[in-house]
Amino acid sequence: MTTMATQGAWLRMTSSAKSMTKSTVTSKELGFLTSQLSGLRISYTPSDVINRISLPSFPGIQPIVARRICPFTGKKANRANKVSFSNHKTKKLQFVNLQYKRVWWEAGKRFVKLRLSTKALKTIEKNGLDAVAKKAGIDLRKK
């Protein structure tokens, strides 16, 4: 034998099932006031897919920060082990010794402000700015 509470719930379920077949479910019946999917497009048309494919894809936007790489030598940070007294090793970065330096460019008859490693500075003193820039593929006219 069923009690009145369970019979009432069963009657409500059958009446709501009939109303669902006839019309759409309202937000009051679902138990929340606004739709959780409001503002979202669930279906796409073929033109949307074509537009997304045909758009040029750009790599992730890099922050405007000077990278710690020497443009002349290609030197970059080295991952090294920091070894403690107990021989416990932890990784650390050994950065390149980059310096901002104004270098005289003889062919352009002017100073060029560069960010280069101290090793590149020694190489420029030995071989000349034009030779080192040409080998690295750097156009000094832009700087």
Curated annotation (Swiss-Prot):
Listed GO biological process terms: translation
CC terms in the record's Gene Ontology section: chloroplast; chloroplast envelope; chloroplast stroma; endoplasmic reticulum; ribonucleoprotein complex; ribosome
Any one GO MF annotation of this record: mRNA binding
Gene3D superfamilies xref list: Ribosomal protein L28/L24 (2.30.170.40)
Disruption phenotype annotation: Seedling lethality. Albino seedlings unable to grow under photoautotrophic conditions.
Predominant cellular place of this UniProt entry's protein: plastid
Localization per Swiss-Prot or TrEMBL: Plastid, Chloroplast
Keyword Signal tagged: no
Domain of life: Eukaryota
Pfam families with a match to the protein in the record: Ribosomal_L28
PANTHER family cross-referenced by the UniProt entry: 39S RIBOSOMAL PROTEIN L28, MITOCHONDRIAL, LARGE RIBOSOMAL SUBUNIT PROTEIN BL28M
Family (UniProt): Belongs to the bacterial ribosomal protein bL28 family.
Record note on quaternary structure: Part of the 50S ribosomal subunit.
Name of the protein described by the UniProt record: Large ribosomal subunit protein bL28c
Organism of derivation: Arabidopsis thaliana (Mouse-ear cress)
